[in-house]
């Protein structure tokens, strides 16, 4: 029952993800951060099989860091998204990863951006995107309330509406969510929306 969603506002991108580590009917953990920081101005929110998700996002993170180390300049968000898509496409015929990604970033020239990359290596630049069962409700909520000129406060309010909708509509809804923002000041954690604490 994973839920990952994000949107682009006026000079920033925001992503939110549930924090449940689930296998079949078992909940292993409810504080699993599924949003990885790629570098100072990029975030990757991922859903999918836990092993694939962790291994692939770490692989992308290390390769983005390696590129910056070798060349002295960071990859742009578009370049990082295209690299990620290429690696997924290469793996697709050999040992496919079951992982879906929303990549959010901020570049000086291009501004804030959000890229949708699914498990079969489809890549799209989007204003808003979502994966998982929660996407049915978060996408419809964002379709109704989203504006491209939203402030951070308005975007957080919209994210909270999406989380509320997911919690009220899904039979087995994820209880906790983490929210992260990337803008000209860098990538940072905004906060957690917790309804269940660890036992």
UniProtKB/Swiss-Prot annotation:
Its main location: cytoplasm. CDD domains: proteasome_beta_type_2. The modification N-acetylmethionine is found at residue 1. Keywords: Acetylation, Cytoplasm, Nucleus, Proteasome. It is found in: Cytoplasm; Nucleus. GO terms for biological process: proteasomal protein catabolic process. This is Proteasome subunit beta type-2-B. InterPro entries: Ntn_hydrolases_N, Proteasome_alpha, Proteasome_beta2, Proteasome_bsu_CS, Proteasome_sua/b, Proteasome_suB-type. Non-catalytic component of the proteasome, a multicatalytic proteinase complex which is characterized by its ability to cleave peptides with Arg, Phe, Tyr, Leu, and Glu adjacent to the leaving group at neutral or slightly basic pH. The proteasome has an ATP-dependent proteolytic activity. GO terms for cellular component: cytoplasm; nucleus; proteasome core complex, beta-subunit complex. Ubiquitous low levels, higher expression in siliques and flowers. Component of the 20S core complex of the 26S proteasome. The 26S proteasome is composed of a core protease (CP), known as the 20S proteasome, capped at one or both ends by the 19S regulatory particle (RP/PA700). The 20S proteasome core is composed of 28 subunits that are arranged in four stacked rings, resulting in a barrel-shaped structure. The two end rings are each formed by seven alpha subunits, and the two central rings are each formed by seven beta subunits. The catalytic chamber with the active sites is on the inside of the barrel. Pfam families: Proteasome. Belongs to the peptidase T1B family. The lineage of its organism: Eukaryota, Viridiplantae, Streptophyta, Embryophyta, Tracheophyta. Disulfide bonds: none annotated.
């Amino acid at each position: 029952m994973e839920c990952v969603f994000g949107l682009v506002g006026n000079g920033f991108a925001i992503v939110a993800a549930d924090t449940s580590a689930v296998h079949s009917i078992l909940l292993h953990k409810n504080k699993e951060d599924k949003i990885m920081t790629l570098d100072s101005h990029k975030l990757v929110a991922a859903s999918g099989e836990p092993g694939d998700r962790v291994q692939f996002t770490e692989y992308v993170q290390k390769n983005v860091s390696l590129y910056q180390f070798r060349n002295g300049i960071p990859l742009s968000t578009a370049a990082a998204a295209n690299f990620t898509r290429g690696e997924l496409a290469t793996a697709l015929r050999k040992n496919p990863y079951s992982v879906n990604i929303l990549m959010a970033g901020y570049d000086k020239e291009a501004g804030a951006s959000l890229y949708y990359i699914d498990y079969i290596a489809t890549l799209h630049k989007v204003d808003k995107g979502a994966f998982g069962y929660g996407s049915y409700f978060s996408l419809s909520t964002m379709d109704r309330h989203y504006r491209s000129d939203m402030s951070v406060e308005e975007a957080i309010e919209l994210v909270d509406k999406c989380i509320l909708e997911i919690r009220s509509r899904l039979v087995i809804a994820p209880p906790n969510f983490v929210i992260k923002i990337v803008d000209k000041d860098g990538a940072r954690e905004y906060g957690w929306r917790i309804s269940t604490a660890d036992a």
